[in-house]
């Protein structure tokens, strides 16, 4: 799935793991205001067994171990949270990510089947979400415990819980950020990303700088091969005409003109590598010295929650509920177990 590969790969690379453990006695917190004890949300409970506490159990193919492991959803979400976001980030940002991670896996189970035999889902970033059980600490456990069973609901349905590292200023609709060719989901919207200008600590500060602005150079043959996988025959040379044929409402490139041929920008990003071509918010594009050189802002497809935006909002005092409902419109947070 295009959006899954893009989303998980860029997060795993953009947000290196680290941080300090936080000792805490963990207990599930009350559901947010508006969340019911057992909400009427359509989710694939018939596919899953539950443990003695009523928490669904997953068969997860762990790529690193090359085997299927049985874990409950909450334990799985801990590993995802540690893989998708730094484990020393503000607690409310981690809680927001946990709600999205839980929603993501249930939406995956509702719509898809893992390519790994005997598994419900995997830790393969091309299939689902990043996962790093070794980076789980007390802060991660607290974020998951305090959001236990909570998911996003869009009119009683599980939404696509999209997220990205940095919006570059504005979030995107799915049709421009992901090349979404279906009806635009009613819960996506373009809003200011709310990312901070600076971050505390040298590691976070460096990560933020890399997410704010990027530049990449691709040899012509690499670009031509990538375009070929997309069914577009492109030949590049120094001085070739390169244009942004169409931009979406958030300013992202939707279609690129490469020496007379048109290619979908989000597709090209995946084909070239989403950790190199970090976004489609392209600010410059040129062909010189045997390479396609481009620069841009932001990191990721731009749809849904900005992780750096969640960081900034949490630092400013926003709750997890306020964060996720800022990025997704007309949604509620509901408790499934």
Specify the residue positions occupied by each region the protein language model found.
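Conserved, single-site charged/polar hotspot
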Residues: 1-337
């Amino acid at each position: 799935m295009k959006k899954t590969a893009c989303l998980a790969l860029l997060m795993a690379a953009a947000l290196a793991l680290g941080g300090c453990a936080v000792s805490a006695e963990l207990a599930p917190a009350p559901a947010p205001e508006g969340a019911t004890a057992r909400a009427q949300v359509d989710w694939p409970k018939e596919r899953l067994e539950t443990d003695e506490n009523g928490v669904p159990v997953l068969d997860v193919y762990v790529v690193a171990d090359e085997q299927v492991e049985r874990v409950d959803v909450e334990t799985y979400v801990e590993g995802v949270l540690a893989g998708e976001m730094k484990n020393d980030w503000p607690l409310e940002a981690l809680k927001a990510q946990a709600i999205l991670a839980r929603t993501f896996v249930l939406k995956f189970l509702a719509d898809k089947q893992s390519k790994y035999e005997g598994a419900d889902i995997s830790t393969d970033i091309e299939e689902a979400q990043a996962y790093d059980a070794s980076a789980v600490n007390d802060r991660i456990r607290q974020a998951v415990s305090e959001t236990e069973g909570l998911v996003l609901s869009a009119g009683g349905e599980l939404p696509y819980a999209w997220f990205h590292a940095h919006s570059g200023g504005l979030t995107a609709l799915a049709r421009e950020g992901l090349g979404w060719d279906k009806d635009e989901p009613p819960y996506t919207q373009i809003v200011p990303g709310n990312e901070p200008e600076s971050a505390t600590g040298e590691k976070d500060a460096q990560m933020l700088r890399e997410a704010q602005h990027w530049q990449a150079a691709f040899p012509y043959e690499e670009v031509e091969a990538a375009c070929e996988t997309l069914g577009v025959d492109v030949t590049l040379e120094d001085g070739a005409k390169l244009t942004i044929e169409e931009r979406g409402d958030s300013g992202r490139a939707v279609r690129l003109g490469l020496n007379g041929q048109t290619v979908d920008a989000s597709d090209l990003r995946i084909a070239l590598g989403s950790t190199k071509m970090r976004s489609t918010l392209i600010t410059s594009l040129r062909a010189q010295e045997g390479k396609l050189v481009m620069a841009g802002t932001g990191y990721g497809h731009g749809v849904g929650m900005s992780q750096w935006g969640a960081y900034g909002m949490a630092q400013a005092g926003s709750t997890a509920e306020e964060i996720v409902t800022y990025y997704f419109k007309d949604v509620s947070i509901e408790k499934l177990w």
